[in-house]
Amino acid sequence: MQKIADLVSFKLTEKQKNDDNNPEKINSHQIIFGCTGTIGESFPFEVIKKSIPNLIKQIKYTQNKYIWTKAALGIMTTDTKPKLAMEECKIGNTKVKIYGIAKGSGMIEPNMATTLAYIFTDANLSNEILKKLLKKNVANTFNAISCDGDTSTNDMIAIFSTGKANNQKILNFTDKKLSEFDTSLNK
């Protein structure tokens, strides 16, 4: 996986240099993989490695109303429909957005479906606070998912923040200004 992360890092950085006035180096440790597949089958490294340059060329930086639907469709495997959600709330007086996409279906062997979920926000929150909020909110939601008492070995959820909302800096996980965000994250 490190070789693929290195290739993605290199190609994304290269694309940014061509597309952006202020390109940033994208390091391989900033790339996260969510894997799904049949246990015991080899991961198709070469197929994925060969596909990366073309996939990165197709990246568009413009936002449109279909971007989250496209992202949800892009991670579907055995799902019958895309799974996405969006919430708006406030941190202090600043409006922030939370988007979530997921994949996963209620199936067990031989077609067990891995649940992968990704949450994105424009809230300006530290990694430490995001991790604490996520951990608190998955206890009775994501971590309570099972299918006939089984869970997949690769289930994962991750949260990402761009910080572009420019809300007031929050220093403590228990800050009351986070209550609306916390409630929205739990939906």
Region locations from a protein language model:
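A glycine- and small/hydrophobic-rich beta-loop-beta segment
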Residues: 162-187
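Glycine-rich, mobile lid/loop segments that gate access to catalytic sites or pores
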Residues: 2-14, 24-142, 152
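Membrane-embedded hairpin module used as a gating/binding unit in multi-pass transport
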Residues: 137-144, 156-166
